[in-house]
Amino acid sequence: LRDTDTQLRTLREMKQAGRIRYVGITTSFDKQYGEFEQTMKKETLDFIQVDYALDNRDAGDRLIPLAGDRGMAVMINLPFGRGRLFNAVQGKKLPEWATEFDCVSWAQFFLKYIVSHPAVTCAVPGMARPEYVSDNLGAARGRLPDAATRKRMEQFIDSV
């Protein structure tokens, strides 16, 4: 979020010239959310990219709904909370009720929470090994959690 006016002007010129297709902004820092939100309200953007995870839901309170209301695509980075979520559940079994939304791993549990948000377009998880790619793709298969199940997932992760 540095010199946003100049950067967005440049990006719009590039879009108009056909050099890029989409214009958006990104942040991974809660302390920038206020300025980020103001930019979202003031500017016409194609997308935003923000950090959002089952244990870090701040962007889901204001930024993600605002993007949905304004017709902006929403890309989620850090859906595993910089590894915090895996650390929190290390040695724990997946809840039995995770089968209700076709979930067979913790990575899928975390990603299905993210992509089931009605305003989220996609998640961008980091993957260090090929088997992680396969597992993460499993989150795109089968049922997604509904609103009540999403709340249950939040309560579960808040309790660990």
Regions found by a protein language model. Name each.
Residues 42-47, 61-160:
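Structured C-terminal cap/extension of enzyme domains
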